[in-house]
Amino acid sequence: MSRRNAAEKRPVLPDPQFNSRLATMIVARLMKHGKKSTAQRILSDAFQLISQRSNGADPLEVFETAVRNATPLVEVRARRVGGATYQVPMEVRQERGTAMALRWLVNFSRTRNGRSMAQKLAGELIDAANEAGNTVRKREETHKMAEANKAFAHYRY
């Protein structure tokens, strides 16, 4: 184990455009090679597309619903016990769950078919808000794995 002190947790400031901390977090995950303004443009374009496609619904609410639907509650973690590796189900802290949901949303958006990243992100967010799409499937898969390995729950650490 490390002898150093744990790194100080920096507060996430709300996004200046949408006044949302989740927006700041997804911009950080969308960003490639430090190009933050490009990531912010992708997000704002995606939000415009969401409001067009969902008959003027608030895109920030759609986004927050999508993140809520994609956030896992349990996950499995590998634990080595006497030469055997067990997949131990563990509860996910809210912070980590949100981070996982955002990471999945961005990654599955990138693998989608579409013209621009904004269109792909908008599509994935709308699907996740409607409890469909790859991101929600990934969360369900994670929950199923945890359920299947419930027998090893007593190995929790």
From Swiss-Prot:
One of its GO terms (molecular function) is structural constituent of ribosome. Its main location: plastid. NCBIfam families: rpsG_bact. This is Small ribosomal subunit protein uS7c. InterPro entries: Ribosomal_uS7, Ribosomal_uS7_bac/org-type, Ribosomal_uS7_CS, Ribosomal_uS7_dom, Ribosomal_uS7_dom_sf. Signal peptide: none annotated. One of the primary rRNA binding proteins, it binds directly to 16S rRNA where it nucleates assembly of the head domain of the 30S subunit. Belongs to the universal ribosomal protein uS7 family. GO terms for cellular component: organellar chromatophore; plastid; small ribosomal subunit. SUPFAM superfamilies: Ribosomal protein S7 (SSF47973). One of its GO terms (biological process) is translation. It comes from Paulinella chromatophora.
